[in-house]
Amino acid sequence: MSATLALTEQLIARASVTPDDQHCQQLMIERLAALGFECETIASHGVTNFWAVKRGTAGRAGKLLAFAGHTDVVPTGPLEQWSSPPFVPTHRDGKLYGRGAADMKTSLAGFVVAAEEFVAAHPQHRGSIGFLITSDEEGPATDGTVKVVEALAARGERLDYCIVGEPTSTATLGDVVKNGRRGSMSGELVVKGVQGHIAYPHLAKNPIHLLAPALAELAAEQWDEGNEYFPPTTWQVSNLRAGTGATNVIPGHADLLFNFRFSTASTVEGLQARVHAILDRHGLDYTLNWSVSGLPFLTPRGELSNALDAAIRAETGVSPELSTTGGTSDGRFIARICPQVIEFGPPNASIHKIDEHIDVRFVDPLKNVYRRVLEQLIA
């Protein structure tokens, strides 16, 4: 069994349901400390994080390439629906089954073994290697990567390159890498009316009727046209609530939850202003609370994307596509202190599902891609 596969199995066997790390990080830290990494645990409100760095011969003058990822996994769902216990790594039909196999314990194992092989082959490597690992990516993500980034920023630590081990591939290993993600912003809108008897609408004010024209305009709005890297910004309603459940009462208020997924072609302030303008134009009496869970980030083609492209082609023969689709990731936090952030990992078809798995034949090539990038950028 390869070193990467063995470590993947060890990590899967630890039931690290968010935010409980179950000592996965300690397992990684022990391996990294043996290589000469300086390892620092940064805990916050029950969340376990660590930052580890091994300086190259150039010290802080050299480039720093960091691997970032998460040890936490989502809950298993109904255990009886799994073909094998989710925290017992199981081989079947050329695949390794277990919660976290694809998202993202194989990537974590690949990071560690790639670093071990690289340091053994290049003991005098010029650049530096970092690890930024959290147990709060699948949860609220309020005490995880963002806390490590804040700590690093406070001490003036800057990363030059960062690979996030998210499962970005689709049909086969290496076909898709993510060089950015859209931002996410939600709004909680309450439109006020006047409650009354449904037979006497002239004595009441129906907030649903008042909201409907504005809602139609918001849904039809073209927020931007996107750009070379991002599709157009989208606005979607996630929840709409009003009424008491009775058939003869006009409700006193209507509550709407909505979400923007927005590109670098728009700004938080610009989108908020346009929403308020539409609501005001319809004369609504309302309150609106905003929540921004992530800003968009983008890494244009450059040293990191070129190195990753070359490594994937050499290892798999696949020509990767740069993409910014999907939800948010911890890359949005890391981009604050790193100009080049790219996500790359195994196929994602089974993530968060019953019987999550990874094709075993992708395990070592994934590690090899990570090692090749180290060799190209910091050897």
UniProtKB/Swiss-Prot annotation:
Substrates-to-products reaction catalysed: N-succinyl-(2S,6S)-2,6-diaminopimelate + H2O = (2S,6S)-2,6-diaminopimelate + succinate
Residues where Zn(2+) 1 binds: 70, 103, 166
CDD domains recorded: M20_DapE_proteobac (cd03891)
Pfam families given in the database record: M20_dimer, Peptidase_M20
EC number: 3.5.1.18
Binding annotation for Zn(2+) 2: 103, 138, 352
Known role: Catalyzes the hydrolysis of N-succinyl-L,L-diaminopimelic acid (SDAP), forming succinate and LL-2,6-diaminopimelate (DAP), an intermediate involved in the bacterial biosynthesis of lysine and meso-diaminopimelic acid, an essential component of bacterial cell walls.
Family affiliation: Belongs to the peptidase M20A family. DapE subfamily.
Protein name listed in UniProt: Succinyl-diaminopimelate desuccinylase
Gene expressing this chain: dapE
